[in-house]
Amino acid sequence: MNLPKQLRAVRVYSFTSCLRLTDAVWVALLAARGFTLAQIGLAEAVFHLTSLLCEVPSGVAADLLGRRLNLAVSAVFEIFSDVTMAFSPNLAAVCAAMALKALACTMISGTLEALTYDSLKTAGRENEYLQADAKISVLQKLATALGSLASLLSDVLQFARFYLANAAICFCSLLAALTLQEPLVTEAQAARQQNPFADIAARLRVHITDSAAVLRTAPLSVRLITADAIISLPSYLTTMFVQQRLVTLGWDASWLFVSPLLASAAAMVCTALARRLHPGKLRPLYRLCALVCGGGVLLAGAGPAWGCLVGPMLVQASLSVWFLHAMQRFNDAIPSDRRATLISVDNMAYSVLMIPASPLIGLIADVTGLAGAGLCALGGLVLLSALTLPRRK
């Protein structure tokens, strides 16, 4: 394997898959079409329900059939999602598009990290994963920041054109996926390369049994999965509901890019700085990151307009630091043959919490008439997780 070429392809795929022109304005776009925050929260819940159902199966598919194939299929589903959303006439169609988007995201999550780690491992350079992941993370956040600038085009693109432009970008992701090579670390992976579907039923049974055994015998991985799920809750919900809060504070939709742009910039800076950190234990790091994250959510939900800018910056900055080190420890603790599956379990735990959290936060906002009320409740939950973190026995 040509490792530099492989990593370049991974970076291109990471960048284009995160260059979403609608993420900074999709709530405002749907609200402008007459959807309530509770309905939008329901659509988001459909996204996470689909993620919950498909997260682990997609990880299993990546481990048994190939990570490169998973990434290519993800881009195809993303294209279908954007086209469906572009021409969605009602809430049912919006929910269908969100389900397709969730399916695309599950095909990426776990798969991209596993492919990157094992690509390095084939060259005996897995100790460089932290640096490689940091570069990928910076590119992803740069793409997110650039995508948020698309809100400036809200008067030009309108609803359908936003999503059709997304579909064109996703086609570039598909091309990048097709240039990747499948990393073969173990004998099982080499055998799979010859015939991915050979003895698939027997391999699936063994894979599920062995993956469950890893979770039983690696308590660190279980603790990391739990911590990741809790601290991740504000990641998207803050971005989502700050959009409508800024609108209620008098902001024009064309300026909604400012908040996610600043948040992405903060995340990029903190990711670069976090590479220089070498925490001996993750417990104090989690407590610090959760305190900063929860405080940022409270600021975004209860503060003035500037709080809607600073709050998401604190959220994304703290999450960038936490996940850079948490994923390094998690990858070190799990085997290559089960890597995508177990990372998918980590992501599934997040979806389990997001299914009730998303519509509940929207409902709190609708009932109270305050767009930031749900965010305040969420911020309190994250702060509580930091303050009540149990001691390791």
Q: Where do the protein language model's features map onto the residues?
A:
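Helix-loop junctions on the cytosolic side of multi-pass membrane transporters
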Residues: 166-195, 389-393
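Hydrophobic core of transmembrane alpha-helices in multi-pass small-molecule transporters
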Residues: 15, 81, 92-108, 307-322
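Helix-loop boundary and gating motifs at the non-cytosolic
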Residues: 1-53, 217-261
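Cytoplasmic helix-loop-helix junction between adjacent transmembrane helices
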Residues: 99-141
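Helix-loop junctions at membrane interfaces in 12-TM secondary transporters
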Residues: 4-7, 86-98, 299-312
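Conserved MFS/SLC helix-loop-helix module at the cytosolic interface between two early adjacent transmembrane helices
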Residues: 52-89
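C-terminal transmembrane bundle of multi-pass solute transporters/carriers
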Residues: 44, 240-393
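Juxtamembrane intracellular "pre-TM" segments in multi-pass secondary transporters
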Residues: 1-4, 181-226
